From Swiss-Prot:
Enzyme Commission no: 6.1.1.21
Record's keyword annotation contains Cell division: no
Descriptive protein name: Histidine--tRNA ligase
Gene Ontology cellular component annotations, sorted alphabetically: cytoplasm
HAMAP family linked: His_tRNA_synth (MF_00127)
Chief location bin: cytoplasm
The keyword Disulfide bond appears for this protein: no
Pfam families: HGTP_anticodon, tRNA-synt_His
Family the entry assigns: Belongs to the class-II aminoacyl-tRNA synthetase family.
Gene field: hisS
Compartments where found: Cytoplasm
Length: 442
């Protein structure tokens, strides 16, 4: 006999969990569509050569890579952005530019499994391809804010930085292995200051004084300063080199655009330590954390990548986008008790007291569905206790009972499973009026 078990870092979803996830994905999809983003799909499995060039050394260690039955070198996608680059290169002539897309799908990384972190997880990506305008960067942040608010999340912070600022800091301190240094800096939250110092010393051949001065600059944060105060405080850095100057100027322009969009200034702050470990980022980058739940990590991250298609096409296309980590958000929303705990999407359960009443019950159920109310018929004619127990377990809001009197008079008796209220022999229209009073629960 085989023991039923699930691999570490992977999980089954029971109906309640799957319903919760579907509801959240539906809400963010509506937000994406409201901004004009259109859906696309790409395969879970790609040629390894498609995925590997843009993966950091850490990500490469986590990629599920193997030979398929045709002896081809293939890998499971680790994000949705690299497949997007391949997709755009293949189809750009028919897509039209600029191109705004969203994609929702599972990705795979062999990282250490822990709370809120899985080896298979769902990403919700939205990207603006084919424009270098900072208006696009501002819109991506606007979509992040709208998406989190659609999920009833208000207490969060988007930490913003610019890769040119980090490149400029590395240039100022004479760091030659810039990508490696930034990959290590990106692990500041994960391995701490001492861990980063050790890795920089080992991997980038930097002396301790240089490392300490570099990390002191990398840890510059806006914190409670106003935007104007912060930009005044860091103005001197623009004289260090062109990278720092360009990065800070872009952030100043971005803040003007976000101000025009009237996004609350409490929701976004500059943090020079935000690096994003993926090597394809070239411009503004951001990570979003929930205040009071920092240990969960980033729930939405992204940035600008101005060499999106360089590995696949001579025609270079810029892009900017972000990815919502829906699985981490489910963990957070569950702890905050903001999730629907029902194990059904049907609002009404119809129970029959006799086999001959099923034809009437099915007609009632179909009429309810046509009125926009999800309904199901309990499949057995039994004592009322069993369907009531079933409804309590699943989370139906109402049970409609069809007994002899209801069958003869073509009415139904209705019980609200939340309040305990029971009304007998109602007409369909009256029952519909009562059931429909709480349509927001559908």
């Amino acid at each position: 006999m085989i023991t039923p078990k699930v691999l570490s870092g992977f999980k089954d979803r029971l109906p309640k969990d799957a319903i919760q996830k579907a509801q959240l994905l539906s809400k963010v999809s509506v937000v994406f569509q409201s901004f004009g983003f259109v859906p696309i799909e790409t395969p879970h499995l790609e040629y390894a050569e498609v995925l590997l060039p843009d993966a950091s050394s850490d990500i490469q260690k986590e990629i599920y890579r193997f030979k398929d039955h045709g002896d081809r070198d293939v890998a499971l996608r680790f994000d949705l952005t690299v497949p997007l680059a391949r997709f755009v290169s293949l189809h750009h002539q028919t897509l039209g530019m600029p191109f705004k897309r969203y994609a929702i799908g599972n990705v795979f990384r062999g990282e250490r499994a822990q709370k809120g972190r899985y080896r298979e997880f769902t990403q919700c990506d939205f990207d603006f391809i084919g424009s270098e305008s900072l208006v696009c960067d501002a819109e991506i942040i606007q979509v992040i804010v709208a998406s989190l608010k659609a999920l009833d999340l208000e207490d969060f912070c988007i930490s913003i930085n610019h890769r040119k600022i980090l490149n400029g800091i590395c240039e100022y301190f004479g760091v030659s292995q810039v990508n490696e240094a930034l990959r290590i800096v990106d692990k500041l939250e994960k391995i701490g200051l001492n861990g980063v110092e050790e890795e920089l010393k080992k991997e980038c051949d930097l002396d301790l004084n240089t490392i300490k001065e570099l990390l002191e600059m990398v840890q510059i944060k806006q914190n409670d300063l106003s935007h104007a105060e912060f930009f005044e405080k860091i103005a001197y850095l623009k004289d260090y080199n062109e990278n720092l100057k360009k990065g800070i100027q872009d952030l100043e322009r971005l803040y003007q655009l976000l101000g025009d969009l009237q996004i609350s200034q409490n929701l976004y702050k500059i943090d020079f330590s935000i690096a994003r470990g993926l090597g394809y980022y070239t411009g503004i980058v951001y990570e979003t954390t929930l205040n009071g739940m920092k240990s969960l990590g980033s729930v939405c991250s992204g940035g600008r990548y101005d060499h999106l298609t360089q590995n696949f096409s001579k025609e270079n296309l810029q892009g900017v986008g972000a990815s919502i980590g829906i699985d981490r958000l489910i963990v957070a929303l569950s702890e905050m008790q903001l999730l629907d705990e029902r194990s059904t999407q049907a609002k009404v359960l119809i129970a029959c007291m006799h086999e001959e009443y099923f034809s009437y019950a099915n007609r009632l159920a179909e009429s309810l569905r046509q009125s926009g109310i999800f309904s199901e018929v309990y499949p057995e004619a039994q004592k009322i206790k069993k369907p009531f127990s079933y409804a309590n377990h699943k989370g139906h809001e109402f049970v409609a009972v069809i007994g002899e009197e209801e069958f003869k008079s073509e009415t139904l008796s209705l019980k609200n499973m939340h309040s305990g209220m029971q009304l007998n022999c109602l007409s369909f229209l009256k029952a519909l009026e009562i059931i429909g009073e709480n349509d927001e629960d559908l």
